[in-house]
Amino acid sequence: MLPGIGDDTWRCTVAEILVLGAGLNGLSTAMLLARDGHQVTVLERDPAAPPGLAEAGPEQAWEAWERRGVSQFRLPHVMLPRWRELMERELPEVLGEVLGAGGPRLNLLAMLPEPRRGPLRAGDERFETVTARRPVLEAAVAAVAERVPGLVVRRGVAVTGLLADPPAPGRATRIRGVLAAGGQALRADLVVDCCGRRSPLGSWLAAIGAPRPAEEREDCGFVYYGRHFRSRTGELPRAEANMLQHYDSVSVLTLPGDNGTWSVVLTTASRDRRLRALRDPDRWDAALARYPLVAPWRDGEPITGVDAMAGLEDRHRRLVAGDDPVAGDDPVATGVVAVGDAWACTNPSLGRGASIGLVHACALRDVLREIGAGGISGDPEKLVRRFDEVTVAAVEPLYRATLWFDRGRLAELAADAAGDGGGGGGGGGGGGGDGGREGGPGLAEDPRWAAGKALFAASLADQDVAREYLAVSMLLTTADEVFTRPGMAERVMRLGAGAARYPLPGPDRQELLAAIGA
C-alpha cells in the first residue's frame, strides 16, 4: 500500500476509463481498474490478437504474433521477483496463465552456486519469479484480461489525438476522451496513457493548445546484442553468477525463458564502434566463449540470429509542471495520466520496466480508490495532483536509481574504451540520485558508486551480502536500506572495498577485441 493510502479509504465507485495500449503495462493497469468496478476500454493500434495459448500453444505466440507497435517484442526479457510479488498479490491468475504456458517458476538465489549463497533459508522465497519470452508473456496477460468483467480490449484502433473541453481561463485543459483514426470520438472520465516509451502524449496535448509535459530526455547510450536459444535437453543452463554481469567494455545478461528457452544479451556503449562487430553471430559467439561463467549458456540451439537494439532514450515526463514557465506547477491537463514507460523509461538491461510499471499501475488504482469517482469527474485536478504526489514519492525513486546506475555504467564503458581503466569495478545496481554521463563528473567523486561496487564485490565472498545485493538488483530493497542496517556498511566495505575493477573472470578489452577480430 502506498504512502497516505489505505484500504479503509476505498469505496466502490465507477468511472469510464480509456487505457491506451494493450501491452503488459496497459493490460495490467486495465485489469486492476476493472476489478475495482470501473468500466475500462483498452485501445490498441496493432490489429492482431494473440493466439490462444491453450489452443495454439506458446510457439505460435512466439513465431506468428505480430506487434509492430512494440519494437522490442521479440527481444530478450525477464520478469523480476518484484513483479512476481505484486502479481501474486494483485493478479495471481496471470502467473497461473504464464505457468500453464510453460513459463518456469524460478528462485534466482537458488540458481546461484551453493558456495555463493549457502543453504536456502526462510525468506529466500522472495527471490522467486515467473518469467517467459515477451510474446508468450503478453499472450498470457491478454488471456486473463479477456476474462475480466468490465474490461473490453479493442484492437486495430489507432488513437490520433485527444478530445478536450473548450479552454477556460485559469483552468487546465480538461481531457474528455480520444480521437481515433477515421474521426471516431471515444469519450471517458479518464484517459490512461500506457503507450510506452514512444508515447505521443506530448504532441497530442500541444495539438489542442495545452502545454507539453515537462520532460527530461537524453540518449540512453547503450546498444544491445541479444540472441535466443532452446535447450537440447529441456533443462536451463546452470547459473554461475547473477543474471547481469559486468566486464571490461561489456555487460552480459543471461535470462531464462519458457519451455526450455533462454536468451543472452551483450550490452555495450553505443559509441563503441569497435564492438559493433557483435552483430555478427560468429563474432558474438566468439565473444561469449571468452567468459567462463557465461559459456554454459552457449550450449543450446540458437533460435534467432543476433538481434540488435539501439537508439533508446532515457525519458521522464511530468504532467504537473509543464514546459511553460508561466504556468508553474499547474497540471498541463486534467482527465489524463501517464503510467509506466509512458511516464518514464530508461535502459532496459536492468529488467526493471515491467516491475516499475506495475508499481505505478497499483499506485493509480490506489489513488482512484482514495478520491472516488466523484473526484475523477468532479475534481479532476485533484486526481492529477494526487497521482503526481504518489508517483514522486513511491515510483520516481525507482526510476532515479536506475538512471543513476545507467550513467555510472556508461562512464565505466567510456573509460574502458579510452583505455584509462577509470570508473570503478563491476557489479552494482542500487542507490539513488544522479551521476555523470560521459564527460560529466568522475565516478571517483560519487561515494555511492564506490559503495555499490563494494556491495557487489562483497556479495562474492559473503552469503548474507549476496542476498542483499540480489535484493537491491531485483527491486526488493534499496542500497540505502541495506547500508543503514546495523553493521552492514562496515561489513561490505571490509570485504568489497579495493576489489578488482571487474572481479568476475573474463577477458580485458584487448583480449575481447582480438577474439572478435575487431
Sequence positions of predicted segments:
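Helix-loop-beta segment of a Rossmann-like dinucleotide-binding subdomain
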Residues: E114-R134, I175, T267-R271
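C-terminal helical "tail/cap" subdomain of flavin- and related membrane-associated enzymes
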Residues: V367-G424, G432-A518
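N-terminal Rossmann-like FAD-binding beta1-loop-alpha1 element of flavoenzymes
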Residues: A15-E55
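FAD/FMN-dependent oxidoreductases across multiple families
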Residues: D272-R386, V390-A394
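Extreme N-terminal leader/targeting segments of oxidoreductases
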Residues: M1-I17, R35-D36, P47-A48, Q60, ...
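Short beta-strand to alpha-helix junction loop
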Residues: L75-M79, D124-A143, P200
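N-terminal FAD cofactor-binding segment of flavoenzymes
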Residues: L32, P50-L112
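Predominantly flavin-linked oxidoreductase catalytic cores and closely associated redox partners
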Residues: R147-A287
